[in-house]
């Protein structure tokens, strides 16, 4: 619903200006998930193995792009998808070193897949972007001890994540879905300016 009006914000309230160099719907589609790529930039380091669950979705594509920038040529970005369409989409973008469809796979099967792809090292960072329930154990099992799991998905159950990790003796650090980090709005809009392929896909899907 489009309106003309005024918003009264608390002093601590966050807001972002719509930029002049892109359509409003395109900007809003990116701002909706702006925290994910900005947090990815903080979490990922050169040479790491990074697993992104839901890599072909809106937040997943942005995270894959940022993760590859951060891990460089010696790191590895593994994109995990659920549908044929999202699998092909992220493959075409070329941000991931490996793309695998895990639709119908159990967490243990995904663990074995990631183990094979990383030579047994597992992921330093796992980012869950898929907005469906019961992905907690998949993310935990992909990640090495002392690694980081970032649950960006709002479908995450804290109970399942915490008790599941404890139950299998996994010493991972878990970040639960904080979609805000300083400068996240401009950071994410800049990704669309930097990457023409990403901007084209976002325009076609969301704008």
Predicted regions and their residues:
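NAD(P)H dinucleotide-binding glycine-rich loop of Rossmann-like/cofactor-binding domains
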Residues: 1-49
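Glycine-rich NAD(P) Rossmann-fold beta1-alpha1 loop
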Residues: 34, 54-61, 65
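Glycine-rich helix-loop-beta junction characteristic of Rossmann-like nucleotide cofactor-binding loops
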Residues: 40-46, 118-120, 141
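Residues at the starts of beta-strands that form the adenosine-phosphate
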Residues: 49, 74-77, 148, 173
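Receiver (REC) domain switch-region micro-motif
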Residues: 50, 124-126, 149
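Adenosine-nucleotide cofactor-binding segment
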Residues: 68-134
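C-terminal capping/lid region of NAD(P)-dependent oxidoreductase domains
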Residues: 120, 189-207
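Glycine-rich phosphate-binding loop and adjacent beta-alpha segment
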Residues: 130-195
């Amino acid at each position: 619903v489009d309106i003309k009006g005024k918003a009264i914000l608390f002093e601590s309230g966050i807001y972002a200006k719509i930029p002049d160099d892109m359509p409003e719907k395109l900007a809003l589609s990116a701002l909706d998930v702006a925290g994910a790529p900005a947090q990815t930039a903080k979490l990922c380091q050169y040479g790491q193995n990074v697993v992104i669950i839901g890599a072909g979705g809106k937040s997943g594509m942005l995270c894959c792009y940022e993760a590859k920038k951060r891990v460089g040529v010696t790191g590895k970005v593994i994109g995990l998808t659920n549908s044929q369409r999202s699998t092909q989409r992220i493959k075409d973008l070329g941000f991931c070193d490996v793309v695998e469809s895990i639709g119908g796979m159990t967490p243990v099967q995904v663990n074995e897949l990631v183990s094979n792809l990383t030579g047994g090292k597992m992921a330093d960072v796992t980012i869950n972007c898929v907005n469906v329930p019961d992905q907690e154990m998949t993310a935990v099992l992909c990640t090495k001890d002392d690694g980081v799991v970032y649950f960006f998905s709002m479908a995450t159950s804290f109970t399942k994540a915490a008790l599941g990790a404890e139950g299998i003796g996994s010493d991972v650090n878990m970040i639960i879905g904080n979609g805000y980090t300083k400068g996240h709005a401009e950071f994410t809009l800049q990704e669309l300016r930097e990457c023409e392929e990403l901007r084209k896909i976002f325009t076609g899907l969301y704008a």
